[in-house]
């Protein structure tokens, strides 16, 4: 039995809430837990023996993923190929699948894994596949529970408790439906493309009848969740099942959400024994990832839940906790970075503080209330920012190429 896999990577006009981090690196390639966001997906898929072909589907330029694919191909020899399929326009989560259906199904593929790029998860794909085979399902989706307050931000489903059969699905409901949500990870039987074709034909009929007001070029747009899954779940003749994962899961939508995702990936790697031991005499509180090319002085204190990229320089007395430090950053003596993200080429002056507020990995919101105003919990510095000596930046979002000379709290610096 042969399976293929599709990772939906979107495009430059999607994922805008991830700015300013996506200004200098495409969101799917932003490093979390020491590796690119979609590397974690590939690592999980490589453990499924039947998966031979992996397709990245989106509308970025082909050059965006070229170097990444060339690099990771040698990491995953079990794959016959990892290929990027570029949409001619933004086709939606279902439109891209339908457009490239012949390539995805080539080679007598019986099952197709479909995964959104912007999810952080332990990826229990074998368990998902086992349920799919056991139930002889058309679709098996991974589900998890969230708080009632968070539920309306996701695709909510109602399932039959005794069997796990999905009875109803609504994407981002306007009123409370359920606190069981779709994780954005699916296994489809190959016959799903017949259902996607029907959904595509229904959409064309609606366009012809002018039931939808469409922007120019959106005629071929098809949502996997709204146009395909929702109608299927309401059809009692279709076998749609849910696998409820007890393990960690969260979306990576906003820039700040990368910090709790980083913590989850580092903790998993440390627990599994796959986290490389940092080659430094600095004080380390695990879990911590430090790139081998980074220079961390002996007097620094790093961790827990910190990722440090290549060519970073950290001086004596610096303190970093619950943060992501991207490539080529400089953190001067006695500076403090807490609950923050520093994009590439940032410089933090002596005795300065760049800090956010703590967020729980299970907390899906990355904003807090300050003086009755919603502000960023995680401080995010865009690329090439400079914070002068003895300056404090707290709960701020700073766009690239900014020079901070005075203290800031709860600001968006444009």
From Swiss-Prot:
Catalysis performed (reactions): alpha-D-mannose 1-phosphate + GTP + H(+) = GDP-alpha-D-mannose + diphosphate
PANTHER family from the UniProt entry: SUGAR-1-PHOSPHATE GUANYL TRANSFERASE
InterPro entries from the UniProt entry: GMPPB_C, Mannose-1P_guanyltransferase, NTP_transferase_dom, Nucleotide-diphossugar_trans, Trimer_LpxA-like_sf
Lineage: Eukaryota, Fungi, Dikarya, Ascomycota, Taphrinomycotina
Locations listed in the record: Cytoplasm; Nucleus
GO molecular function, one term: mannose-1-phosphate guanylyltransferase (GTP) activity
Natural source organism: Schizosaccharomyces pombe (strain 972 / ATCC 24843) (Fission yeast)
One Pfam assignment: GMPPB_C
Function: Involved in cell wall synthesis where it is required for glycosylation.
EC number annotated for this UniProt entry: 2.7.7.13
Enzyme class name: transferase
The name this protein goes by in its record: Probable mannose-1-phosphate guanyltransferase
Keywords: Cytoplasm, GTP-binding, Nucleotide-binding, Nucleotidyltransferase, Nucleus, Transferase
Pathway connected to this protein: Nucleotide-sugar biosynthesis; GDP-alpha-D-mannose biosynthesis; GDP-alpha-D-mannose from alpha-D-mannose 1-phosphate (GTP route): step 1/1
Family of the protein in this entry: Belongs to the transferase hexapeptide repeat family.
Keyword Metal-binding found: no
Keyword Nucleus: yes
BP GO annotations: GDP-mannose biosynthetic process
Signal peptide start and end residues: none
GO cellular component annotations of the record: cytoplasm; cytosol; nucleus
């Amino acid at each position: 039995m042969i399976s293929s896999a599709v990772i939906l990577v979107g495009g430059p006009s999607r994922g805008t809430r991830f700015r300013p981090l996506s200004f200098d690196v495409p969101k799917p390639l932003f490093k979390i837990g020491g590796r690119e966001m979609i590397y974690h997906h590939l690592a999980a898929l490589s453990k499924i023996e039947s998966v031979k072909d992996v397709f990245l589907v989106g509308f970025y330029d082909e050059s965006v993923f070229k170097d990444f694919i060339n690099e990771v191909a040698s990491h995953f020899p079990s794959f016959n190929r990892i290929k990027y399929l570029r949409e001619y326009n933004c086709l939606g989560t279902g439109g891209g699948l339908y457009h490239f259906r012949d390539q995805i199904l080539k080679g007598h593929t019986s099952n197709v894994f479909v995964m959104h790029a912007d999810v952080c998860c332990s990826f229990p794909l074998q368990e998902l596949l086992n349920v799919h085979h056991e139930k002889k399902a058309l679709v098996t989706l991974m589900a998890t529970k969230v708080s009632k307050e968070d539920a309306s931000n996701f695709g909510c489903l109602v399932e039959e408790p005794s069997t796990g059969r999905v009875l109803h699905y609504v994407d981002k409901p306007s009123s409370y439906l359920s606190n069981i949500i779709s994780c954005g990870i699916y296994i489809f039987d190959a016959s799903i493309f017949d259902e996607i074709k029907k959904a595509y034909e229904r959409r064309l009929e609606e366009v012809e009848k002018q039931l939808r007001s469409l922007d120019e070029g959106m005629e071929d747009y098809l949502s996997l969740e709204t146009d395909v899954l929702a109608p299927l779940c309401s059809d009692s003749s279709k076998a749609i099942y849910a696998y409820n994962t007890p393990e960690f899961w969260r979306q990576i939508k906003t820039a700040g959400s990368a910090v709790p995702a980083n913590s989850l990936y580092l903790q998993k790697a440390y627990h599994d024994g796959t986290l490389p031991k940092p080659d430094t005499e600095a004080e380390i509180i695990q879990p911590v990832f430090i790139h081998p090319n980074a220079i961390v002085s002996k007097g620094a204190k790093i961790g827990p839940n910190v990722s440090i990229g290549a060519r970073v320089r950290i001086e004596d007395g610096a303190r970093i906790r619950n943060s992501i430090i991207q490539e080529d950053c400089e953190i001067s003596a006695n500076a403090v970075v807490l609950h923050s993200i520093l994009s590439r080429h940032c410089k933090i002056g002596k005795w300065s503080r760049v800090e956010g507020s703590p967020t729980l990995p299970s907390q899906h919101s990355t904003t807090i209330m300050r003086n009755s105003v919603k502000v960023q919990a995680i401080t995010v510095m865009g690329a090439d920012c400079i914070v002068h000596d003895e300056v404090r930046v707290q709960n701020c979002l700073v766009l690239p190429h900014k020079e901070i000379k005075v203290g800031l709290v709860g600001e968006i610096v444009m």
